[in-house]
């Protein structure tokens, strides 16, 4: 128990979990979201903004596999340069990194959801699990809603 937790007493301890969660409703379903501590938010930001090279490489291989057939027939649309493929001037390695960032953001935000069933955890949730359940449009909508409830509003930040 923390110093503040002790000072606020047993009733506070009983309600602490509720204090650190917020709700949002999406199509009639109520989702609970755990508000991350600052250190957790920092860790999420780091994980999202700097995906590991192994993940980027895996995604790169997946998205460029169909393009490899054009390696001997390069055109202005498909250009093979060192360790990258440019499609209409756009780097597929950069596209893979952006996809890794998006998937990490979605996964880390979904891990903030509080399961309804007692004893269930989302700590080991993967993007594949999320993708299996929701199309990308719904994933992005849920992430947007999570972002809204975990970010303080101007009024809350100002203290009025």
List each model region and its residues.
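Short, surface-exposed, charged amphipathic helix/loop patches that serve as local interaction elements
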Residues: 29, 34-160
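Extended acidic low-complexity intrinsically disordered regions
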Residues: 2-16
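Short acidic-hydrophobic surface loop/beta-edge motif
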Residues: 20-28
